[in-house]
Amino acid sequence: MISIIIAYATPEKQVEIPLTVEESCTLVVAVKRSGILQQFPEINLSQAIVGIHNKRTALDAGLRDDDRIEIYRPLTMDPKQARLLRAKRGKIRRMVRGEAG
């Protein structure tokens, strides 16, 4: 038997579920056994991106002791657009405070 953690986060809540599974267990089986799909019905496992220790991994991947399985949410905004928006907000803040920019 091996010990793993299933992790998922929303903007409001972070969940880590410790789980003990057989050494032959795959990632998809562990996620289903954890009960996280019942806690977060918005997770569509067939379309979800998953990883182990911050590295993208296939659903049929094998597991090792102390693995942390992470279920990632889809991006809500293009990363380039998000950075541009943050830069514009920063420029406006500097202008309001009277800083050069």
Swiss-Prot record:
TM helices/strands, residue ranges: none
User: The organism sits in which domain of life?
Assistant: Bacteria
Against Pfam families, the record matches this protein to:
Ub-RnfH
Q: Which residues form the signal peptide?
A: none
- Which InterPro entries does this one have? Mopterin_synth/thiamin_S_b (IPR016155), RnfH (IPR005346), RnfH_sf (IPR037021)
NCBIfam families cross-referenced by the UniProt entry: PRK01777.1 (NF002490)
Regarding protein family, the annotation reads: Belongs to the UPF0125 (RnfH) family.
This one is known as Protein RnfH
